[in-house]
Amino acid sequence: MSKRAYFGTDGIRGQANKHPMTAEVALRVGLAAGKLFRSQDERRHLVVIGKDTRLSGYMIEPALVAGLTSVGLDVRLFGPLPTPAVAMMTRSMRADLGIMISASHNSFADNGIKLFGPDGYKLSDAQELGIEALMDQGLQEGLAAPRELGRVKRIDDAQARYVEIVKATFPRHLNLSGLRIVIDCANGAAYKVAPTALYELGAEVITLGVSPDGTNINEECGSTHPEAMAKMVREYRADIGIALDGDADRLVICDEKGVVVDGDQIMAIIAAASHKAGTLKGGGVVATVMSNLGLERQLNTMGLSLERTAVGDRYVMQRMREGGFNVGGEQSGHLILSDFSTTGDGLIAALQVLAVMVETDKPMSALGRQFEPVPQLLENVRFVGGKPLEAAAVKEAIADGEAQLNGAGRIVVRASGTEPLIRIMAEGDDPALVKKVVKSIASAVKAA
């Protein structure tokens, strides 16, 4: 089996109570994962589960638990916890599998299931396909005997454990005393842990998006709506604003003037500081095809390279592991610092930026513009069915655009892994030409 029926680029994701994000599919994931582990050896296996604050988490979590325990796996429940924390706890608790129930930056109506291996890394494509192969078996197959059913326990101090891990990534000789920080937790998984970590490191903390009600996650707040954070930074005259997304694996920052700093600039800040300190590994940074050409040029001036991958933090992490890199990420704010974490961690990345601020005694406005971005335009075109990228007219429009840019820019056209969208991105030194190229390709996609 090579074609994915359930898993996309970031686990299983969709609208709650619609295929594939139903209680039945969650039950089948639990059953299939359990059967896969039991087929490998007969010992007791342990699975840990975390979730964000979506209402549908109350439906998905017990369905997963039912599937796992019915085939004899033990389960530990964390409750609301960031995705990177679940990855860390999977490893520290010697679990065989970690599961995060979240649709990240999507609205509350969506949910998702992400799987982590015992090393804290996202499962490989082959491992996910192995689970998929067992998901369509009958629900009565391979069940455990009554005495062999799994047991379930809640871990009450999971949030406190993660706070301590996060604080340990901040240099011991520094603290955040004297800094006024706005933190927007998107009414999501970090609503307790992020303000706590910043406060315990000495900051004056002003909170936003810390009142989840099950339906307000990412709603006009968080990393996808940084204007809320920026407004509060200006109002309270804060030194910096930090916005996380619903599962806290994504980070956007703004400076003391409310100017937003994206993932590319944050990578440049951390890479430059690490390079200066002699701690940058791999001779550069790993990012995706969507990262700005300006980042690549900036790194080149320091004698560093930018390695590009397909879109998706799993592919960034994969390249980082292959090449021995320790800084990578996406323009959208997924930032992976592999010295500290096995996946994107917004809070840890924010602390490393704060460390640079404190160490250099510079305001965020002096750090946030590491390079001048090359004009870049992104347009999303929704499609109903078919494969528009295979249409001859679309291929012709892309080739024509590349010819017009003539090596002084880039074009990336791809299908979203999580939504029925074609994402069209072009960048180059001539903004008018970039706009013309994007509009031409978008028109071809719409007509396909």
From Swiss-Prot:
The active site is at 104 (phosphoserine intermediate). The keyword DNA-binding does not apply. Binds 1 Mg(2+) ion per subunit. Keywords: Isomerase, Magnesium, Metal-binding, Phosphoprotein. GO terms for molecular function: magnesium ion binding; phosphoglucosamine mutase activity; phosphomannomutase activity. GO terms for biological process: carbohydrate metabolic process; peptidoglycan biosynthetic process; UDP-N-acetylglucosamine biosynthetic process. The lineage of its organism: Bacteria, Pseudomonadati, Pseudomonadota, Alphaproteobacteria, Caulobacterales. It comes from Caulobacter vibrioides (strain NA1000 / CB15N) (Caulobacter crescentus). Belongs to the phosphohexose mutase family. The gene is glmM. The modification Phosphoserine is found at residue 104. PANTHER family: PHOSPHOGLUCOMUTASE (ALPHA-D-GLUCOSE-1,6-BISPHOSPHATE-DEPENDENT) (PTHR42946:SF1), PHOSPHOHEXOSE MUTASE (PTHR42946). InterPro entries: A-D-PHexomutase_a/b/a-I (IPR005844), A-D-PHexomutase_a/b/a-I/II/III (IPR016055), A-D-PHexomutase_a/b/a-II (IPR005845), A-D-PHexomutase_a/b/a-III (IPR005846), A-D-PHexomutase_C (IPR005843), A-D-PHexomutase_C_sf (IPR036900), Alpha-D-phosphohexomutase_SF (IPR005841), GlmM_bact (IPR006352). Pfam families: PGM_PMM_I (PF02878), PGM_PMM_II (PF02879), PGM_PMM_III (PF02880), PGM_PMM_IV (PF00408). It comes from the Bacteria. Its EC number is 5.4.2.10. This is Phosphoglucosamine mutase. Activated by phosphorylation. It catalyses: alpha-D-glucosamine 1-phosphate = D-glucosamine 6-phosphate. Catalyzes the conversion of glucosamine-6-phosphate to glucosamine-1-phosphate. Mg(2+) binds at residues 104, 245, 247, 249. GO terms for cellular component: cytosol. Its cofactor is Mg(2+).
